[in-house]
Amino acid sequence: DKIKELNKALEKYLEEHKDENTEFVSGLYERDSDFLKFAMYPEIVSEVKQLIGEDIILWGSSLFCKKEKNGKETPWHQDGEYWPIKPLESVTVWLSIDEVTEENGPLQYIPGSHLDKKLAEHNTLDSTNVTLNQTLKNIDEIKDQAKSVILKPGMFSMHDVYLFHGSRANNSGKRRAGLTYRYMPASSFYDHAGAKVIEDKIGYSLQRQLHLISGVDKSSNKIYQNHTK
């Protein structure tokens, strides 16, 4: 049962890292390879192919585990503000481990905000109560258009690299844990050297293992493992 597998992997990770902040953990499968297999679920890869084609590189994963009380807010942002991908094409899968409700801080998004494929201006936040330190500058003008993504355990949503999205703090008394997996078309290039400039801005490493999970690499990426053989 996949939901049991997800929970088992999460509980093991939380136990092993109980003295660390696990509300936001980047580079997840580099830290714990147990999380790599979930990115290759056939039902997920099939949906990713419909969006970015047959040649696919898995390049990142994160854990978002909001505590039952005082679970941190994720500020409104675009994922592309953080990522050294050229050309900038990527899709994120948000895989739910816990039930996601309106009360426990669901992912929210602005419909259609990705369509012009442009990065909007972001500000840097100086706060310990958020998972990320970048936020969209003029988001207050359109927040009333936001929609919430409500999920049962094992369900997943997908969003584009340019989509405006974020999530509220969790004070519901009910944990909200989920995994994100990042995929890019293998026609794009992950610029490990260029990532260092962004790292200084966001405060965490963007050095990633790249996994070819479908098709062929077309942009001379530094592939860590080829899963198509």
Residues covered by each model-derived region:
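Short, conserved beta-strand element in jelly-roll/cupin
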Residues: H77, P84-E102, I150-P153, M158, ...
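Non-heme Fe(II)/2-oxoglutarate
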Residues: L14, F156, Y162-K229
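Double-stranded beta-helix
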Residues: E102-R168
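Short, surface-exposed loop/helix-turn segments at secondary-structure junctions
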Residues: Q78, T131-K143, G173-R175, A193-K201
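Non-heme Fe(II)-dependent double-stranded beta-helix
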Residues: D1-I85, H122, G194, R208-L212
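Feature marks short, surface-exposed loop/turn motifs that line or immediately flank catalytic pockets
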Residues: K67, T101, D116, P185-S187, ...
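Residues that flank catalytic or metal-binding motifs in active/ligand-binding sites
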Residues: R31, W59, E89, E103-G105, ...
